[in-house]
Amino acid sequence: MKKLSVIFLSVSMLSGIAFADKDKVVATYKGGEVKESQIMKEFKPQLNLQSGETIKNFDDFPPQDQEKLIKIYVNNLLLKEEVAKSNITSSKEFQEKLENAKNQLAQQELLANYIKSNITDKMFDDEYNKYVGNLKGKEQIKVAHILVKSQKEANDIKTKLSKGGNFTKLAEELSLDKASASNGGVIGYILLNQPGQLVPEFEKKAFALKVNEVSTPVKTDFGWHIIKVLEKKPVPIPTKEEAKVTIDNILAAEVLKKYIADLEAKANLKIMLPKADSKAGS
C-alpha cells in the first residue's frame, strides 16, 4: 500500500510539473513576471486577424517575434504603472480627450452595428454577381517602370534600353520610386480603369503596350516614366469567399452613405455658406 502511494505521488508530481511547464515564465521585471498565457491572451485575437492564420501556441512564433511581443507587453505594463503614478488622467484636457475618444468609439460601434444589420445575403449575392460581371473578359497586365524627374533623364534611359540596357538594373539604380525599384521596377498586376490604382496617363500607355515592349517617356504628376509590360493574362474570377472583403467594403460604403444622407434629411440640414460662384465673382 505504501509503495502504491509513493507511485501515485510521483505520478501526481510529474503531472504537476508537466502542467506548469505549459505556461512558462518568458520574462521577469521589477514587480512581476510574464507568462506565455498572458502574451497569448493579449495578442492572439489581433494576430490571428492580421495573419489570417490560426495561432495556437506561443511557440508558433519565431524567436524574434516572441521577444518583440514580450517587450510590447511589458512596456505597456510599465507605462500603465507610470500613468497610475501621475495625475495626468485628472486634468481637464485629458478628460475632454477621453470624452472625445469615447464618442468616436461609440459612433464606430453604432455604424458597425448598423452595417451588420442592414446588409443582407441577397445584397451580398447581387453585389458579388455585379462585381464578377465587371471582371469577366477583362485583362490584367503586370507592369514595371522607371521614374525620373526630367524628360531628358527619361530619354537617356530609353536610349540605353534600346541599345540593350537591362531594365531591371536601370530601375534599381535610377528609379525614384524606391518601393518598386528594389524589385527591379515591378509594380505588379493592374486592371484598366480601377479607381485608386494608377494615374490615367500611366494606365493608358501601359495597356497600349505589348508584352516585353518598353514605352516612350510618359509624363504624370509624379515625374517621367518609362513603362514595361511583363505579362498579360485574363483577370481571374474570385470566389465569394475570396471577394468577401471587397464586397463587404463596397456594401458598407453604400449603406453608410444612405444612412448619413437620411440623418441629414431628418435633421433638415441647410448649409448657409455663400455659393461657390458668388464667391468667385466677388
Curated annotation (Swiss-Prot):
Any GO molecular function: peptidyl-prolyl cis-trans isomerase activity
Signal peptide location: 1-20
Gene3D superfamilies (UniProt xref): 3.10.50.40
Keyword terms, alphabetized: Cell outer membrane, Isomerase, Membrane, Rotamase, Signal
Enzyme class: isomerase
Cell compartment(s), UniProt: Cell outer membrane
Enzyme Commission identifier(s): 5.2.1.8
GO cellular component, one term: cell outer membrane
S-S pairs: none
Catalytic activity line of the entry: [protein]-peptidylproline (omega=180) = [protein]-peptidylproline (omega=0)
Ranges of residues in domain PpiC: 138-231
SUPFAM superfamilies assigned: FKBP-like (SSF54534)
Family recorded in the similarity comment: Belongs to the PpiC/parvulin rotamase family.
Full protein name: Parvulin-like PPIase
The organism of origin for this protein: Rickettsia conorii (strain ATCC VR-613 / Malish 7)
Lineage: Bacteria, Pseudomonadati, Pseudomonadota, Alphaproteobacteria, Rickettsiales
